Amino acid sequence: MSAVDAAAGAADGAHLAAGTVVGVVGPTAAGKSALSVALAHALDGEVVNADSMQLYRGLDIGTAKLTTDERAGVPHHLLDIWPVTEPASVAEYQRLARAAVDDILARGRVPLLVGGSGLYLRAVLERFEFPGTDPVLRQRLEAELAQAGPAALHERLRAVDPDAAANILPGNGRRIVRALEVVELTGAPFTAALPDPSPYYRSVQVGVDLDTARLDERIALRVDRMWADGLVAETRLLADQGLAEGRTASRALGYQQVLRFLAGELTESEAYQETIRATRRFVRRQRSWFRRDPRITWLDSAGSGLVAEALRVVRPAAR
């Protein structure tokens, strides 16, 4: 953060309305974490993690989780809360995140909800009721998944709910099964269960991004740094803790590819290159999700005075 940004933060922070949640969103490698720390200092805030993979203990290098020093004294909530064997639950995350937000607000501070997992952010900020589950139906669908594979079930989902199919990867069997379960239970599309646009909290959202060529370059540099920092060794350690059996954590970018290398399915060079390619594909999907939300004000993370610009967005919107 520049001296100009720091001065702007000190001047602007006091104008934030009480009870407002600040969202900092955007694609992987765009600069959300650094901006959130600077904003937290300017606004007397605390960060609530909304990155689905940073919820897992030990997934540090591959998720670019900030170190204690990089957090610069800013409290961070909902990091390292689950073992790598725990399946992700948006409903459980919603409960934990709202409890953290409420606690921060009760202490008169500003919650900053920060991450690139769009559904997690919306589940906190908006009114979202989770459909129930049926163990018998779930067991049947999971048996079909094991027999026919995710691609076949994805085609079935495409026939009954094309919008959901467009937002779920053909290889993500767990989410495909859940979507089909909701369709059968409710008789309505899975997308009908997405958060209602009505707000749960008063909020203002800032998105950070930069042009594709520069972001692609950042991604390549980030993956190079991950390898240099010991991603392979970290994945080996996590494999001993059951990472490969973790239905969610095993799909984390970088870890998924290194697990395939450790299993002999890829060379290390292939795992490295595939991590870059997979991250770039993931960024395209993140952009598609976030760009549909007109409430997000987008800023160029490569621009000068980013923190001051973000505060100029936050201040009037939060009054």
UniProtKB/Swiss-Prot annotation:
EC identifiers of the protein? 2.5.1.75
The reactions it catalyses are: adenosine(37) in tRNA + dimethylallyl diphosphate = N(6)-dimethylallyladenosine(37) in tRNA + diphosphate
Keyword DNA damage, does the record have it? no
Any matching Pfam family: IPPT
GO aspect biological process, one term: tRNA modification
**Which parts of this chain are annotated as the region Interaction with substrate tRNA?**
51-54
Binding of substrate occurs at T28, A29, A30, G31, K32, S33
Q: Where is the signal peptide?
A: none
Site positions for Interaction with substrate tRNA, renumbered to this chain?
Answer: S117, R138
Kindly give the Gene3D superfamilies that the UniProt entry links to this protein. 1.10.20.140, P-loop containing nucleotide triphosphate hydrolases
Binding-site residues, ATP? G26, P27, T28, A29, A30, G31, K32, S33
* Alphabetic keyword roster: ATP-binding, Magnesium, Nucleotide-binding, Transferase, tRNA processing
The record's section on PANTHER family has: TRNA DIMETHYLALLYLTRANSFERASE
* Quaternary assembly: Monomer.
Q: What is this protein called?
A: tRNA dimethylallyltransferase
Source organism per entry reads: Salinispora tropica (strain ATCC BAA-916 / DSM 44818 / JCM 13857 / NBRC 105044 / CNB-440)
